[in-house]
């Protein structure tokens, strides 16, 4: 494509420049305010003649200049005065670093575009009354082979080469890598090495009432193991692990030899660890607050602990940081008063304030270049250009249509209605290519707003974004050739378009992608967005006057609406006018900030004045749903997002784990790689190994599946891996090796068998042969299970491994437990899947865990079984095999064949066989009632469809649970064009038979079922906003069933938003009656399922 070579730079306010030239020269003293000269002593890399003393240069540096200009000034002085001038002729300024010392640490002055007077070192020297300050000029050395090898190891773990900058148009990736060094080092230096090594999994939430009932006199029994012996001791639920160890050693004072404890050792030499798991009970936390202890109490299991030596904190050693630190002032510009061109001599202007740019923003569309044309002939094409901020389109223009050829040239300027000074930080220039048949697009002028009629007939083909203000706060300028993303066709990938269209990354596949050439105005100086200086709001007092009662009620009604309720223009106007009143109610914040006109600089300044007075927000209790709302795709302002992150700081580790999936997705909505949210995730991952483990897999999975955000997730993951320590790096390496090896085996097995449900004996034989080869050659001897880092799997039990009868041919694998302190020989069962995106299953299982925590606050234990499931790559993942459980289909078939679907008594008889003792049978029925109620409510609220007897399971203790969540939010499956879901949830006659009832009869167990359902349903209604927000944040991730707000409307309807508590109760009881009336339809579907073998055996036991 031939492009123009030169465009004239824009000259800002020519009249101002002429006026400045006529000004009389002022004295040095008077000019310091506009062009401050700062004395700095530079220590040069060369030595004085005949000594080892380094040369120095004392310079007076212009405060308004940037670092690059300062470096050039040093170089010119060195060339003039150094005894080693040849050295400076040979090596230019870019071969050297500028370093300064602060509190014993070396910091690099990294950003060459940073204005000198904003440097952190100047502020530091001022506090110390040090003048002149000292900057060391140090030669840049090539990385050592050891450094390069470590980087290769990190890149392999990340699944992406973070050093590859061939597909970026600026240095944001490298810039962020450097900026994240400081928070990483601060967190590593501040963490407790012993606690980090043992990462106790605790909670500070009160013990639920139903668990309190299981503790007699506030005491629990603990079995402590050592070697081949054990000792049972009675302890208070309020005792800490340290107290328990002390009591144990007092009791065993004369029997140490029985427990294989050397006489010289005491309680300080040991810790308590869960038998068979890498899970420690340490710290000053009462034993009742350890999650493992609560799990044992909940399941009625004994608490078995092993007396163990603590792990060596040295194993978590972090490799010495090779990069100097960069401070948080790096990349920050000055205030408007420092950058403005007004009242300054021309010679004193080095960087110009964006707020001085009063002209409208414009872009020149030069042309597009496509490697392969669409097959359809006689098409025309046009470019639509939007200034976008989050989900808001601030203004829009488009070119005229032209015939669609391999190269289309426009060479036309599009001028927008927004002024340059009003561009907010994070604003995107969104470029989209539309095409359509020639008549549909005729007669349009170049800068016209698109007509809905013509655009409706055109098809969006390609898109790309450019951040208009870069990560350094500088306005983009000059020519760009941007490689565009192609819009996915129909299918699963289309679901991610909502998130993908916010990315500022260009398509790395340069050879095969559409490219667009644009030109932005050039300027004589860099244009910088100034920092906002907190100033009083002159309108503040006027708008804080007493509100009329009618308007107050109207405002309260707006604030009370749920997150899906759209705000009208009138609503927004009211919220903004009474912004100081809205500020008093934290619930108003998402709606208030949605009402801000982010494309007006004066309004943005007033918004920051508001944010400075957010005491009510800071002092309010944490509302996770509310806080997460400010992190969704509707908010791009870094200050708004930062107050949300600041609120999340009070989340305890267990809650961070609950919401980690959404928090990782929310990183996509950040305009820049470095953000408060990215730093929060980094910090919490480095503080707790369990969080770090899941952060690793959530990030790695996104890097593998989301090309649009690969770089962003990769830079965060690299920062984490550089601080997590040697032991974690070793664990991750083993896990990645295992997954890579099993993936190859799965692909080979799939290629051996056609895409059908049966599995031949030849395929099973091949699997066993391949697994034996792995075991004998290079499979790691042990590895942490990705969905449960407390478990370590050892050798494969090959005779128990098989290929499952399903289209995707998942592998059923069983491993020995690698921990010798495990109490049984039970294997660790894992289903390894290739070909399915497990992120939707992960989301549903995560929501089930959150529902459990909601019900816990109401003292409800609904016996949900959210089994382990994790996506480990692009359509790769692992699912936990739940022990001693089977599908309803198997139970029905094993008794009377396919007609078992119509036999009401089959399930009850099976449970009786598994629990022959009456007391155990009654306990199993009780568990069945609660778990059935829990899953009825959960599957109804989440709209989980495609429920058949092969994806509903039951354990031998009566715990019902659902698996395989491919259809959610009411996106139900049809069979022969008929909707298969004729009931709100699954409550079949055989389920009712277990509860002691049939037809319209009742029983004590059925009444209990109804009561529990209603309590569980009403409890979820109190958290409607949280559930809506959690799904909203996953809306843009690429899940085929979660692509629009209409999908999430399902939850709103299911929870009867707007109805009274009494009406909601009646509504759910009515749903139960619908299920009782139509239970036979489910049985008929199940019969068809058994006969036709639809998805038969796809996910047995997980």
Swiss-Prot record:
Give start and end of each PI3K/PI4K catalytic domain: 797-1080
Q: Where is this region: Activation loop?
A: 962-988
Which pathway does this chain act in? Phospholipid metabolism; phosphatidylinositol phosphate biosynthesis
Output the Gene Ontology cellular-component terms: cytoplasm; phosphatidylinositol 3-kinase complex, class IA; phosphatidylinositol 3-kinase complex, class IB; plasma membrane
Where do the record's region annotations for Catalytic loop lie?
943-951
Enzyme class at the top of the EC tree: transferase
Superkingdom of the source species: Eukaryota
Q: Which residues carry this modification: Phosphoserine?
A: 1101
Residues in PI3K-RBD domain copies = 217-309
Q: Indicate the segments forming the C2 PI3K-type domain, all copies.
A: 357-521
The record describes the protein's role as: Phosphoinositide-3-kinase (PI3K) that phosphorylates PtdIns(4,5)P2 (Phosphatidylinositol 4,5-bisphosphate) to generate phosphatidylinositol 3,4,5-trisphosphate (PIP3). PIP3 plays a key role by recruiting PH domain-containing proteins to the membrane, including AKT1 and PDPK1, activating signaling cascades involved in cell growth, survival, proliferation, motility and morphology. Links G-protein coupled receptor activation to PIP3 production. Involved in immune, inflammatory and allergic responses. Modulates leukocyte chemotaxis to inflammatory sites and in response to chemoattractant agents.
Instruction: Provide the assembly information.
Output: Heterodimer of a catalytic subunit PIK3CG and a PIK3R5 or PIK3R6 regulatory subunit. Interacts with GRK2 through the PIK helical domain. Interaction with GRK2 is required for targeting to agonist-occupied receptor. Interacts with PDE3B; regulates PDE3B activity and thereby cAMP levels in cells. Interacts with TPM2. Interacts with EPHA8; regulates integrin-mediated cell adhesion to substrate. Interacts with HRAS; the interaction is required for membrane recruitment and beta-gamma G protein dimer-dependent activation of the PI3K gamma complex PIK3CG:PIK3R6.
What is this protein's record name? Phosphatidylinositol 4,5-bisphosphate 3-kinase catalytic subunit gamma isoform
What is the gene name?
PIK3CG
